[in-house]
């Protein structure tokens, strides 16, 4: 993996090296996996990846905010957001890796 960002191409290459499928098959596998996660979230379902974390769609209610340009109050519309909460296993792994 190059740099500090893991990309789809990096995932495909890692699967190719680990599993030995063709790069094209690995790309299809990664794309299908990400599509399944996205489709579940579109339906409002929770995606739990054991040992990794939980992706969840949450509803945020309307609230009063502020226009950053003018400083005047402005209503922020209700919306849906995607949240991610890392599992305890993932948190511990990151703490060990970062010397925490």
Curated annotation (Swiss-Prot):
Secretion signal span: none
**Which Pfam family is an annotated match for this chain, by its short name?**
Bac_DNA_binding
Annotated GO biological processes are: DNA recombination; positive regulation of metabolic process; regulation of DNA-templated transcription; regulation of translation
Q: Which CDD domains match?
A: IHF_A
Source organism, top-level taxon: Bacteria
UniProt keyword 4Fe-4S present: no
Q: Which residues are connected by disulfide bridges in this protein? A: none
Gene Ontology molecular function terms on file: DNA binding; structural constituent of chromatin
Record's keyword terms, sorted: DNA recombination, DNA-binding, Transcription, Transcription regulation, Translation regulation
Q: What HAMAP family would the database entry show?
A: IHF_alpha
**The protein, known as:** Integration host factor subunit alpha
Q: Which organism is it from?
A: Caulobacter sp. (strain K31)
Q: Which gene encodes it?
A: ihfA
